Amino acid sequence: EQDKVSPAISTLQKLLKVYGLSLSEFFSEPEKPDEPQVVINQDDLIEMGSQGVSMKLVHNGNPNRTLAMIFETYQPGTTTGERIKHQGEEIGTVLEGEIVLTINGQDYHLVAGQSYAINTGIPHSFSNTSAGICRIISAHTPTTF
C-alpha cells in the first residue's frame, strides 16, 4: 500500500484464482460505460406501432435525450385511432403517399412533400384514407417515448 512491498508471483496467482481472473483480465482497463450510439442502424430502430401502422423510433441509448425521431408507415385504410394529446411539439414531412391529420376538429389532407407542425397538447390523429402506403418522418420534443 505504501509502495514498499512487491507481491510475489505466487501470491498474485493465488489472488487471481480466488477472484477467477486471468492475468490479462487483472491488468486490463475497466470497460467504459455504454456511450450513446452515433450511428443507428435500421435494425436498431424500436417498433412502437400496431394494427397496420408502423412507428419506428430512432433511439441512441441516451436516457437524457430531449428529441425523438420516428419513421412512420401507414398501410391503406389505417389510423392512429382515437385522438391523442401529449406535452410538446411535433413536426413531420410526408415522404410518400398521403395522410389526413385531424387536429382541433379540423382535417388537413397532406401529400408527399408537405410538412406539418403541431402543438401535441391539442388532441390529434392521423389516418391513411387512400389506397396507397403513406410514409412520414417526424420529430417530437420533448420525448414522450
Describe each PLM feature range.
Residues 45-82, 139-144:
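A short glycine-rich, His/Asp/Glu-containing loop-to-beta-strand
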Residues 1-7:
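Recognition helix of helix-turn-helix/homeodomain-like DNA-binding domains
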Residues 82, 101-102, 108, 124-130:
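Short beta-strand His + acidic residue motifs that chelate non-heme Fe in jelly-roll/DSBH
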Residues 129, 133-145:
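Double-stranded beta-helix
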Residues 10-25, 31:
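DNA major-groove recognition helix of helix-turn-helix/homeodomain DNA-binding modules
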